[in-house]
Regions:
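Face-selective signature of the C-terminal outer-membrane beta-barrel domain
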Residues: 363-364, 369, 418-578, 602-604
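Extracytoplasmic beta-strand/coil segments of soluble accessory domains associated
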Residues: 179, 196-243
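C-terminal beta-signal and adjacent terminal beta-strands/loops
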Residues: 619, 777-784, 803-865
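Gram-negative outer-membrane beta-barrel transporters
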Residues: 486-489, 558, 562, 666-684, ...
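Membrane-embedded beta-barrel scaffold of Gram-negative outer-membrane proteins
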Residues: 427-431, 437-455, 604, 608-616, ...
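Outer-membrane beta-barrel translocator/receptor signature
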Residues: 231, 247-252, 261-270, 275-350, ...
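Structural signature of Gram-negative outer-membrane beta-barrels, strongest in the C-terminal barrel
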Residues: 359, 478, 493-501, 505-507, ...
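Short, acidic, small-residue-rich periplasmic hinge/interaction motif at the N-terminus
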Residues: 27-43, 130-188, 196, 231, ...
Length: 865
């Protein structure tokens, strides 16, 4: 998969003396004599080049361009500055600048001595006949030219031409107005003090920490509280992250194993319109494309004394020749947080990815990742027990000698957990011939989580009368393996370019899952022969997911494109009990299958204007245990027999119309409306070991997004800005809920807004300044179904950062929550009973929350090489 990118050196000027001037060249590349006293000046010669990424929108429209550039080459042959002198627009200028600043040259020489020179270049982009996103009918690839040194017609042009590979894994083509892609360069301008914050580069996605420590993030998008991943599919290089039938919750997606600096790109879709996305993709998908090389190596140290925050990350991109690309990294992290009871959260991450070019048509990549962490966590606090939180003062009997808790306190300081993850991955890519491409991925991973949550008070928290409290231990240990194979064919029918993709995905999870009642992390198995005869659950789960898909893309006219697809999925799951004394005796097999059609139409009246219409059917799976739960123990009223709403695959349908305009280079504005119907939701609640069958739901709303990206004449000059607003309306649509007025969707976001601006500005040859400001806002939302729902309080948070770099050294600071807002980051409706509150009557439901970060100063120092 290659393209032809000629690089033309049009002229050069030797710097450093008043007499220096452009020198005409001979056919051998030597300066032509201009007189008897002419100096012997040798022009710079290109030594190594870097590959330019073809701008995806330009490649889609088969645009070609030539970008005029002027670069300064120092005495060592390095490019120390570059600017565009002949702009082409459509993203070509930025791509050419990014590539040319990585070039190296044999330096120009005067009388044999290396000297600094200015070189004028022409970087040409030619749309390849076989580009990743090209629908044009295939044609014979041009023969690759060798390195050329030629005399121009005016005896003053040195032309250097090379063949350059197309970066495999270029950004996907945009098939919906809501699709987005964020490059590594833009990611480098954004604050990255936590891994889950990478999700927030996706327009409309909010990610919060709702218990502290290393527990997975809680995410929101388009009217969905997707908790840890129930309705958004997450991938790392095509490896699915959402955990099926997880001990803590369905779709559990912990991103703490990702080192932010190793992410090369973040791609995202909304809705169910992509045929290659299956389980959990009802609201959309987010894919982290990991880097196999980085522009620079870096060692970065972060400190936030008020949080007890320390983070050290080292990323190295070693050079093993032109056929290898490699990146390795390690991260050491420790944090106590603002809490009275320190989180003591420590983790260690390691990462390595390498790509080997096998020949002109194929390459293979390998990746390994490792993560280990342990922590304490604050958990959630009943608002009525917290000073100044607006839900009233606790009853005098609530606490002895204290009327209320600090928002930084904990109802159970023994909460916490530990987690490990190890993953190995390989991917093979080959251009089989001029029509067919193959991509095959194989992966295997092991993950383990031991979590001790207590969503309330350690003593008599649950409303069911249990005397031993509500802390539980959730253990999930799994081996997961799978493959993803895709075959793509490009051709034409009746003169219409077509692209056909067929694929198969297999995933098998072998899981050991346990759930125990605990107190202070001590298991209570058997302490009460009637109510707690043993573990709540102790069993083995084997779950196999099989997916096949086909997608056809056809372009009957330059301004019209259709994408239609179909996907078939099947789930086969077994659960077996491992403890005769377990509260839940779960044994059995369940299987289910679904066929999901997809359809998209894209109309482009102008090159700068696209109209989209999308339809798709999809699903999210439910915990296999919820198909069988039936507790014989009367003292656990939360347990119930399987409900008719219990389905292994909850079907969904999605619709979207939208438009995208690009009025000027670098600026993209989008507007879209969406509707999502979900047939039913049935997920296991890992905190209470009960099932929660829910009827059908519907969400609809609108989304507005804007993004601007600018690269100046100096490639170190960079500016980005983005804005996103989403309004969503979601309700249960079951007739019984409508009649009872209990149609509100708990925790579902109603309105969200985010905006940010950041940039990098060189102020001299050696100095560069950069900074950013972001604002994120979530409106009030409902805490329960109603009919008079509790309200979860909204919030608005502003963060800012600034930094300065001198040559290879950088210093910077970020201020998180500039206004020091006392905000509730994670919120839930919980029925709880505080210590010393009467056992009867059962307290009314209330909001429990995890406090968000206070104003925090975070500093960093970095060294680049």
């Amino acid at each position: 998969m290659r393209r032809l990118v000629p690089i033309s050196i049009a002229a050069f000027v030797v710097l450093g003396s008043p007499a220096a001037s452009a020198q005409p060249t001979t056919t051998e590349g030597q300066p032509a004599p201009s007189g008897p006293q002419a100096e012997a000046v040798t022009p710079p010669v290109l030594r190594t080049r870097a590959e330019a990424t073809y701008p995806p929108d330009a490649l889609r429209d088969r645009l070609e361009a030539t970008v005029g550039l002027e670069v300064i080459v120092d005495e060592t042959g390095a490019v120390v500055d570059a600017r565009v002198v002949g702009p082409a627009g459509h993203g070509f200028d930025e791509a050419a600048l990014e590539a040319v600043r990585k070039f190296t040259f044999e330096p120009a020489r005067r009388n044999g001595t290396p000297v600094r020179s200015t070189v004028q270049l022409a970087y040409e982009f030619h749309a390849p006949p076989r580009a990743t996103m090209d629908l044009a009918p295939p044609s014979a690839a041009p023969a690759p030219p060798s390195l050329l040194v030629q005399q121009g017609p005016d005896q003053s042009t040195l032309v250097v031409a090379e063949r350059s590979t197309v970066p495999i894994g270029a950004p996907p083509e945009r098939n919906a107005a809501s699709d987005s892609s964020t490059s590594q360069d833009e990611l480098s301008l954004r604050p990255r003090y936590r891994a889950e914050g990478l999700l927030e580069v996706v327009p409309g996605v909010f990610s919060v920490q709702h218990a502290g420590g290393g527990k997975a993030q809680q995410d929101f998008v388009r009217g969905f509280n997707i908790d840890h991943g129930t309705d958004m599919a997450f991938f790392v290089d095509d490896v699915p992250i959402n955990a099926v039938s997880h001990a803590h919750g369905q779709g559990f997606s912990d991103l703490h194993f990702v080192i932010p600096e190793t992410v090369g790109r973040v791609d995202s879709t909304k809705g169910m319109y992509a045929a290659h996305v299956g389980d959990f993709g009802t609201a959309g998908s987010t894919s982290f494309v990991m880097a196999d090389h980085t522009p620079e190596s870096i060692a970065r140290l972060e400190l936030a004394p008020s949080m007890g925050h320390e983070r050290l990350v080292v990323v190295e991109s070693p050079d093993f020749g032109s056929k290898w690309r490699m990146a390795v990294a390690t991260e050491v992290f420790y944090e106590n947080g603002p809490f009275i009871h320190p989180e003591n959260y420590g983790r260690l991450n390691a990462y390595a990815k390498a790509t080997r070019v096998l020949d002109e048509r194929s390459e293979i990549s390998f990746m390994a990742m490792a993560y280990g962490g342990s922590w304490n966590m604050s958990g959630v606090l009943p608002a009525r027990a917290v000073c100044g939180e607006g839900d009233g003062t606790p009853r005098p009997s609530a606490y002895s000698g204290s009327n209320c808790l600090s928002r930084w306190d904990s109802v159970d300081p023994t909460q916490g957990g530990a987690s490990q993850r190890f993953m190995a991955w390989t991917e093979y890519r080959r251009q089989l011939d001029e029509h067919w491409d193959l991509k095959a991925t194989l992966y295997s991973l092991y993950s383990n989580l031991q979590l001790f949550p207590n969503d309330g008070i350690a003593a008599s928290f649950q409303p069911d009368g249990m005397q031993y409290g509500s802390q539980v231990e959730q253990d999930d240990s799994r081996n997961e393996s799978g493959t993803d194979v895709r075959l793509t064919h490009r051709g034409a029918l009746g003169g219409m370019p077509m692209r056909t993709t067929i694929g198969m995905q297999l995933r098998n999870d072998v899981i050991e899952s346990q759930l125990h009642r605990t107190e202070g992390r001590v298991r209570l198995d058997g302490i009460d022969p009637v109510n707690i005869p043993g573990p709540i659950f102790d069993g083995h789960i084997n779950e196999l997911e099989t997916g096949v898909f086909a997608e056809e893309e056809v372009k009957p006219a330059r301004w019209l494109r259709f994408v239609v697809g179909v996907r078939g999925d099947r789930i086969d799951a077994n659960v077996s009990n491992e403890s005769p004394t377990a509260v839940y005796q779960l044994d059995g097999y369940k299987g289910a299958a679904q066929l999901s059609p997809k359809a998209t139409a894209i109309v482009s009246p102008l090159d700068e204007w696209d109209l989209f219409a999308n339809y798709g059917r999809g699903f999210h799976s439910n915990d296999i245990r919820s198909m069988f739960i039936n507790s014989p123990i009367a003292a656990l009223p939360s347990a119930q027999a399987p409900s008719s709403a219990g389905v292994l695959m909850a079907a969904a349908s999605g619709y979207e119309v939208g438009t995208t305009v690009r009025p000027v280079d670098g600026l993209s504005l989008s507007a879209m409306a969406f509707l999502i119907d979900l047939t039913s939701e049935l997920v296991i609640d890992g905190d209470t070991a009960s099932t929660a069958p829910a009827g059908p739901t519907q969400r609809y709303g609108a989304e507005l997004t804007g993004r601007y990206s600018f690269v100046g004449r100096n490639p170190r000059q960079r500016l980005y800005a983005d804005v996103s607003f989403t309004a969503a309306h979601g309700r249960f649509t079951d007739a019984a809920d409508v009649a009872a007025g209990t149609t509100y969707l708990p925790d579902a976001p109603i309105r969200t807004f985010s905006a940010g601006i950041g940039g990098r500005q060189p102020v001299s040859r050696d100095w560069t300044l950069q900074g950013d400001v972001t604002v994120r806002s979530m409106s009030d939302r409902y805490g329960d179904q109603g009919p008079t729902p509790l309200i979860e309080t909204g919030w608005t948070i502003v963060n800012a950062g600034i930094g300065a770099r001198w040559k290879f050294l950088e210093l910077g600071a970020d201020v998180i929550n500039i206004a020091d807002v006392a905000w509730r980051e994670g919120q839930f409706e919980v029925q709880s009973r505080l210590p010393k509150e009467p056992v009867s009557p059962v307290p009314q439901p209330g909001i429990s929350f995890t406090p968000g970060m206070p104003r925090t100063l975070m500093t960093h120092a970095a060294v680049y090489w």
